[in-house]
Amino acid sequence: MKQTDTLKILVVDDEDIVRLTLAAMIDHMGHTAECVNDGLAGKQTLKNKKYDAAFVDMRMPGLDGMNLLKWSRQKRLGLPIIIMSGHGSEDSRDEALQSGAYAFLSKPFSLVGIKGLIEKIQDNFNAVTASTH
């Protein structure tokens, strides 16, 4: 029954400040963050590496967050994807959640909000790990 203290989290956002801030928050909580700056890079990274969760911007040039989410569901990657948006309308939130997002996060986000989401993901990860061993 191995439980993990450290999650490996991918951050996909086209804004440098968002990527760097979120990565710093994740690192500060004792987890590992890796960042890419667009959806196509996110897709390629998810093809090649395993992550425990991903924070993905809803609107990006090229492959947007919603299409990356849908692709990950089609490929059955099974990782929780949190969709982030600076234009967080109820319709956007509903679309993300109905498409299989783990959560919807409006920008600007708080450390408390990020911490709560990561703790929930970690609890779920540890529960699944415990039940499979």
Where in this protein do the model-derived segments appear?
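Two-component/phosphorelay signaling modules centered on CheY-like receiver
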Residues: 16-34
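Acidic catalytic/metal-coordinating carboxylates
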Residues: 37-41, 64-67
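Short amphipathic alpha-helix used as the core "switch/output" element in two-component signaling
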Residues: 44, 66-77
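Active-site beta3 strand of CheY-like receiver
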Residues: 50-55
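Receiver (REC) domain active-site loop signature in two-component systems and cognate sites
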Residues: 60
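C-terminal output helix
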Residues: 91, 109-118
